[in-house]
């Protein structure tokens, strides 16, 4: 019996039935009625109750199915009155008694005899009524446990389906009671139940704490034992589904499979080699093998079979190209230069690339080359082709080994450039392009005479268009890292052949030729002037043709013309600049569609022209900037979608789908990507034009940069917005020359927003950008530009960032983990970068508050001290840098904090880690330089330790040089500050003098050569002794030549050295200089003239 009035039931039934009508008009009326009359604050409870009853009890399967789907959709939908579309749900806002009624109906329907498809939909609806933010529902768990014992497999499958969505239903139950449930599911006679059980098991596994994982390990053999039966029975889909679940488990706990790893390798090998299976089964088997390398690389390296198997199966899959097309006729005629339709081949390439990146050449190169040597001599062209593509895929990951074998690799590859089969030629071009990137710039310097002629030979009309295009693309890779001097001898041949490609009747060939010419021009720089007069008129002629069908070609022409202009310089470009600008203005004013590729090319071309013309570009800003402002003001285009729609949306590159609070949210990412591009271009114009851009600053800041920090669904938008802020401020300052009221107001809004972001930003990479923007903004605004409230908020933000970083690093670097390996090098890198930016932001605040910030810093001192006492070098270095900054900018005011860090700092002077020694030495130096009274009792006693640092046998090695030079500068600072108070000062001075030259650390060099100059001026016998003058001169010349000391900074010491040389006979002075080669002597004449 219904809980609703008959009239409500009758009205809503008519609406739901109308939803099933084939008549669009009837459906539209029903949708409107439901939306306007029932999805309201007053009626949503009636509607959800009705839909639950119909899903559970209606004998009309169409009405029941529609009701279940609508119920789930509306349960997830945010209430009409809610402003939190993504977080709020109707199901959590209805009254408890209504929720209880709905739950009762759905559960009764689930347990009754219903069609299998209806029960599936009911299980999805039930799952939405048991989310963790709803009251407990103990009856459900008992019902599911009973259903899992049912003789009807659909009951069992649907029960596991619910547990998949809400695994926490059983996490509170004793694990020993749960194990038999999954054991039974894994051995179920029904394939669908097995799959549902495995999927539910993964969800349950994710919910459990690590301490319980070992208890689940006993189930894994049963899970894996289900796989051979699927294979034997030809159940490809089931096999793929279980592999997908296993992949999730491997990503969580790879070492849980350690004892079964050999069996997994053998079974996946069998599946991948079985070409009778559908591609999804084979590719998911390969993915399972691949994720082991990404999550347990050491386990893979220690297994003899893993590398051999992985290499063998990927090579086999890479031969699966041009099936039933031995001459590759279809491939040759295809205009689509991607090979993604060759699914197994594409998966294999990606897999080998990923595994190589994780395991490296020491492990993978040997098994790979064992097969490659055989394959390149095979009579089967597919094997020769696969060998080339495999080498391309593995090159980056194996670079540690292969970069030393370039001649041998080229001996193997280059003969195949003239292979009879075009796909092998293509593969050869691919290798040459790939290694030109992966082994750059070394390979450009050492092998240009082999690579460039080989690629140029494939640009000729004797080759197929696909090969010509790929050779041209490989030349882009080579040019990107080649100097103009390397390219110059080949330019005639390159340009002659590329101009021929421009005459091709195939659009994609023309487009690639233009891209290659553009990159070569960019690399060749002024060497390209010779070809300017031939190429620029050709490009302009293409741009003048009014044809909307070749917008990409026009875009490539713009790109090419502007890159050539940039290469040859403003003066030469002037000959055609006005003509090109007129064409671009006409295109800008034409009706270009939103999704036309020409729009992006046009925007980038204007940016390059601005780089060429500088301030002469300003008159064009009213034409160029308004469209960018429109794109940059785009809002977040998001929408709630059904789970069934998610796969469709994910097929489109313009959209992304994320899951938040059980909801599927579609994000129109292409709009946001365009927004980022527009913001980056605005940043480019602002950087180039400074004060000339000031007219746009207020609008860009208030309508683009600051609102972008709230774009929580696109990291790039937030990063671009934060980066824009200090650049906009500098434009306004450049225009006015003073800090006017508008500038101060904008800074206050921007800095408050950035500081607030330090607390709320979830991504460490973006937090890093916020700190960087604060530092750059403070540089623009100067002293005391943050209020007391902002300083307090900044301190809280830094504290939160440090706490989060520390916890992340503890999680990754904790004690041995029996389930995972510590492999998060990328995350370490991110955290190191973040800590570096926090160091800079703390320093900026300390510097501009004249020590006033010290009292705020005391609030985060406990966290800094935790870092200081940790064993992780990154954390210790962060703390040491903070200490150095607080002494530099706080000076004698730091006396009260002295005892909190000095014992650890002096201990760090003898650390085995050179980076820590460097930071500690720097601190001792700033103690003497900025707070000599407070730290005299620290600095003088450390002199002997500092001398040991600069004097030990490996002190001048590359890895130790920075720490040595900082210790050297610290000695100089102590000698300068405490000269008369130091016993044996001349001995220490002599020891210091032996540390010169200082050629790596610019800050250390600056002080060391100031001190050297002072010693000379004071006629110190240590440096002024005739026997030492040659060493003095040499140390100064080396510092200037290595640019650790700029010519401007070096004027004082150069002047002192000249004075010192004046004491020598001119012949002796010239003898000192004459030992230098001609290139250095040319500089010496300039420095010492």
Curated annotation (Swiss-Prot):
It comes from the Eukaryota. Its main location: cytoplasm. HEAT repeats lie at residues 6-39, 44-78, 96-129, 138-165, 175-207, 216-252, 260-295, 304-359, 361-395, 399-439, 441-481, 484-524, 526-568, 571-613, 615-689, 692-735, 742-781, 788-849, 852-890, 898-930, 938-978, 986-1017, 1028-1063, 1066-1089. One of its GO terms (molecular function) is nuclear localization sequence binding. The modification N-acetylserine is found at residue 2. Belongs to the importin beta family. Importin beta-3 subfamily. This is Importin subunit beta-3. The lineage of its organism: Eukaryota, Fungi, Dikarya, Ascomycota, Saccharomycotina. The gene is PSE1.
């Amino acid at each position: 019996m219904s809980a609703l009035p008959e009239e409500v039931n009758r009205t809503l039934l008519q609406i739901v039935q109308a939803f099933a009508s084939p008549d669009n008009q009837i459906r539209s009326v029903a949708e409107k009625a439901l939306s306007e009359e029932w999805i309201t604050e007053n009626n949503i409870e009636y509607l959800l109750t009705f839909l639950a009853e119909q899903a559970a009890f209606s004998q009309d399967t169409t009405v029941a199915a529609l009701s279940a789907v609508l119920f789930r959709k509306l349960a997830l939908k945010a209430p009409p009155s809610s402003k939190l579309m993504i977080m709020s749900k109707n199901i959590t806002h209805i009254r408890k008694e209504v929720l209880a009624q709905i739950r009762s109906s759905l559960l009764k329907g689930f347990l009754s005899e219903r069609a299998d498809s209806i029960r599936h939909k009911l299980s999805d609806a039930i799952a939405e009524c048991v989310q963790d933010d709803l009251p407990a529902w103990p009856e459900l768990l008992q019902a599911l446990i009973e259903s899992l014992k049912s003789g009807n497999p659909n009951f069992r499958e649907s029960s596991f389906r619910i547990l998949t969505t809400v695994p926490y239903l059983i996490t509170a139950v004793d694990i020993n009671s749960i194990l038999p449930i999954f054991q039974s599911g894994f051995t179920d006679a029904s394939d669908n139940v097995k799959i549902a059980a495995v999927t539910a098991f993964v969800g349950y596994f994710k919910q459990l704490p690590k301490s319980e994982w070992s208890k689940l390990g006993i189930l894994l053999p049963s899970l894996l034992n289900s796989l051979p039966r699927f294979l034997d029975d030809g159940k490809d889909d089931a096999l793929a589904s279980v592999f997908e679940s296993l992949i999730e488990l491997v990503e969580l706990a790879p070492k849980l499979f350690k004892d079964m790893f050999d069996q997994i390798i053998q079974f996946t090998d069998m599946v991948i080699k079985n070409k009778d299976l559908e591609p999804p089964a084979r590719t998911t088997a390969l993915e399972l093998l691949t994720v082991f390398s990404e999550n347990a690389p050491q386990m893979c390296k220690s297994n003899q079979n893993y590398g051999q198997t992985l290499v063998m199966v990927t090579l086999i899959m890479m031969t699966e190209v041009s099936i039933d097309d031995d001459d590759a006729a279809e491939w040759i005629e295809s205009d689509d230069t991607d090979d993604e339709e060759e699914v197994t081949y594409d998966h294999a390439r990606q897999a080998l690339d990923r595994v190589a990146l994780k395991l490296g050449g020491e492990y993978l190169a040997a098994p790979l080359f064992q097969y490659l040597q055989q394959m390149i001599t095979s009579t089967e062209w597919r094997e020769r082709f696969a060998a080339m593509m495999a080498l391309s895929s593995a090159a980056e990951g194996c670079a540690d080994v292969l970069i030393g074998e370039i001649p041998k690799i080229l001996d193997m590859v280059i003969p195949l450039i003239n292979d009879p089969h075009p796909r092998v030629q293509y593969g050869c071009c691919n290798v040459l392009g790939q290694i030109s990137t992966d082994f750059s710039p070394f390979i450009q310097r050492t092998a240009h005479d082999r690579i460039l002629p080989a690629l140029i030979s494939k640009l000729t009309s004797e080759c197929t268009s696909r090969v010509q295009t790929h050779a041209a693309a490989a030349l882009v890779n080579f040019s990107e890292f080649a100097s103009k001097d390397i390219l110059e001898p080949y330019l005639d041949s390159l340009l002659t052949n590329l101009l021929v490609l421009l005459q091709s009747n195939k659009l994609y060939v023309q487009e690639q030729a233009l891209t290659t010419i553009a990159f070569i021009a960019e690399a060749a720089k002024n060497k390209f002037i010779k070809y300017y007069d031939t190429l620029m008129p050709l490009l302009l002629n293409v741009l003048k043709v009014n044809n909307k069908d070749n917008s990409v070609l026009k875009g490539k022409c713009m790109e090419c013309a502007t890159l050539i202009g940039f290469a040859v310089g403003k003066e030469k470009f002037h000959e055609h600049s006005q003509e090109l600008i007129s064409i671009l203005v006409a295109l800008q004013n034409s009706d270009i569609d939103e999704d036309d590729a020409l729009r992006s090319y046009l925007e980038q071309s204007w940016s390059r022209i601005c780089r060429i013309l500088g301030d002469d570009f300003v008159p064009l800003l009213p034409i160029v900037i308004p469209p960018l402002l429109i794109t940059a003001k785009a809002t977040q285009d998001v929408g709630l979608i059904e789970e069934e729609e998610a796969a469709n949306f994910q097929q489109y590159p313009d959209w992304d789908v994320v899951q938040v609070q059980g909801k599927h949210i579609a994000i129109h990412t292409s709009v946001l990507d365009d927004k980022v591009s527009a913001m980056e271009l605005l940043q480019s114009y602002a950087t180039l034009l400074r004060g000339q851009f000031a007219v746009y600053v207020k609008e860009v800041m208030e309508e683009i940069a600051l609102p972008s920090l709230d774009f929580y669904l696109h990291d790039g938008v937030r990063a671009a917005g934060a980066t824009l802020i200090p650049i906009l401020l500098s434009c306004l300052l450049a225009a006015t020359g003073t800090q006017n009221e508008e500038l101060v107001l904008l800074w206050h809004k921007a800095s408050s927003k950035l500081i607030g972001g330090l607390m709320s930003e979830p991504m460490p990479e973006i937090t890093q950008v916020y700190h960087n923007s604060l530092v750059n903004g403070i540089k623009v605004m100067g002293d005391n530009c943050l209020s007391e409230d902002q300083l307090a908020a900044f301190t809280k933000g830094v504290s939160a960032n440090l706490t989060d970083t520390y916890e992340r690093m503890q999680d990754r670097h904790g004690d041995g983990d029996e389930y995972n390996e510590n492999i998060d090098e990328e995350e370490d890198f991110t955290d190191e970068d973040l800590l570096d930016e926090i160091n800079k932001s703390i320093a900026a605040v300390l510097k501009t508050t004249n020590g006033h910030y010290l009292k705020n810093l005391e609030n985060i001192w406990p966290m800094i001290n935790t870092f200081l006492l940790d064993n992780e070098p990154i954390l210790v270095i962060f703390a040491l840098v903070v200490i150095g900054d607080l002494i530099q900018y706080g000076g004698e005011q730091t006396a009260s904090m002295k005892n909190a860090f000095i014992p650890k700092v002096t201990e760090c002077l003898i650390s085995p880690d050179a980076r820590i020694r460097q930071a500690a030495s720097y601190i001792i130096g700033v103690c003497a330089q900025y707070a000599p009274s407070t730290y005299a009792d620290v600095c003088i006693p450390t002199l002997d330790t500092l001398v040991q640092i600069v004097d030990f046998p490996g002190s001048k090695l590359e890895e130790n040089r920075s720490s040595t030079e900082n210790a050297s500068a610290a000695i100089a600072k102590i000698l300068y500050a405490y000269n008369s108070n130091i016993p044996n000062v001349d001995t220490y001075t002599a020891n210091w003098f032996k540390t010169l030259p200082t050629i790596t650390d610019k800050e250390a060099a600056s002080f060391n050569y100031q001190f050297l100059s002072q010693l000379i001026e004071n006629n110190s016998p240590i440096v002024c002794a005739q026997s030492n003058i040659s060493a003095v001169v040499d140390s100064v010349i080396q510092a200037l030549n290595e640019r650790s000391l700029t010519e401007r900074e070096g004027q004082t010491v150069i002047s002192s050295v000249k004075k010192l040389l004046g004491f020598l006979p001119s012949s002796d002075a010239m003898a000192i200089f004459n030992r230098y080669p001609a290139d250095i002597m040319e500089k010496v004449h300039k420095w010492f003239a």
